[in-house]
Amino acid sequence: MYQTSPLSLFYFQVLVPKFLECFLCFPYHKISLVALLSFFYCQLQTNMIILLSQIKRFLYRQIMIALKIKAKKFWFIFKYFNVSCDARLFNELFYIFQTYVSVDSK
């Protein structure tokens, strides 16, 4: 269940009724206006959900970039101290980092 933002509540509780009060004097417009408002409200909710998923994907990409940089620094530390670490072990470590982040981001 997604919560609405205070701005959307203000928009639908204050601005829309003031804007549409001239149309509400006609009784045959009431049903269509309620349907139209509910459609726009659902569209707003959908757009908010899409925006949240885009933000989540962006943050996931940024975390993955940071992990790649840290993993490369980790690899250089192994090289600097002459620790035997082959590419397969490095890939396994990076896979562990990647799966840890992907589980936490969902």
From Swiss-Prot:
Superkingdom as given in the UniProt entry: Eukaryota
Compartment list: Membrane
Extracellular topology ranges: 28-32, 95-106
Transmembrane segments: 7-27, 33-53, 74-94
Intervals, Cytoplasmic compartment: 1-6, 54-73
Membrane topology of the entry: Multi-pass membrane protein
Gene Ontology CC: membrane
The UniProt record lists the keyword Transmembrane helix: yes
Keyword Membrane included in the entry's annotation: yes
Primary residence: membrane
Protein keywords: Membrane, Transmembrane, Transmembrane helix
Protein name, as recorded: Putative uncharacterized membrane protein YAR047C
